[in-house]
Amino acid sequence: MQTQANKDQVLAYWAALDAAHADDLGAVCAAHLAPEFTWNGPAPMSLQTGPTAVSKVFWQPLKQAIPDLKREIHMVFAGASSGRADGGTDGETWVCGTGYLSGHAQGQFLDIPATDHPLRLRWGAFYKLRQGRIIECQMILDFVDWFDQIGLPVLPKSRGIAHVYPAPTGYDGVIRGPQDISQTAETLRMGRQFLYGGLNRYDASGLTSMGMADFFHPNVKWYGPGGIGACFSLTEFETLHQTPWLEAFPDRKVQTLDALIAEGALLGAAGVAGVCATHSGAYLTTPASGKPIAVSGLDFWLRQDDKFTENWVFVDMVDLFAQMGEDLFARLHQQIATRSARPQ
């Protein structure tokens, strides 16, 4: 089946990246990616076009900074996308995955200092394939969590628990064989209903207007990005994340997504501007700017019976805060300067 072949192709690309020396990564990208390949990476790198560009801008500098870089894969699955807000399919096929990149930074990457501190960097990625060729990637690396790991936080202490990002509980997230078609269809149906019939139903009268209890298990595990943290129940999720988020962005709406796929009990969503809103209230101490914002994010869910029991969440926080008028890399530089000025 094409779905399985697509996963094998992405897994082979990852294996080649992981095995290569930094100097050889350009050849690896050229061998595995289509010439017209586009990479929507996290800010400040953002959009890159062509295999050479993504190698030079991201993979080579990252591996030069972290020579012992290793990949831990928590999930890999694939499917045909159904991310249109009007309910239609878009005819595209995607493979998605997430996990950790781990190692010890021996050099700088994007001005992030080398500390030789053991790192576990959260990554998520979605790959679009056409006719067996990788033509697009949307990827987020959790920079805010990285900054926090090396003692240079750029946001207030997270309300949720920091640095929690496990593999799925009681479920093999690396799907290699065909899945029950009816289970896949049910996961996708629930995902669409959750996004467009639940989240988008918020009317500012209260959280219950979205009917979150219809979709999330009471003990849902919600693994948020750096700056937000993890929540270990629906009550914690609503209190620690959803309430502050909606106070800041009360008119937020899920848009047509670049990818919404399911395989078995796993669901994935990706959108470069997947949520649009107005920054109407303070968020993580950043005052309301009144500016329109577009949230770039990735999500992964695990369904058990009729509820989602786990949700792994990526938000491009550097891009989000830039739209609100705050430069998180400038905050990093300030933290570095402050630490350097301390008496040794």
Report residues per predicted region:
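C-terminal and inter-domain tail/linker signature
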Residues: 1-344
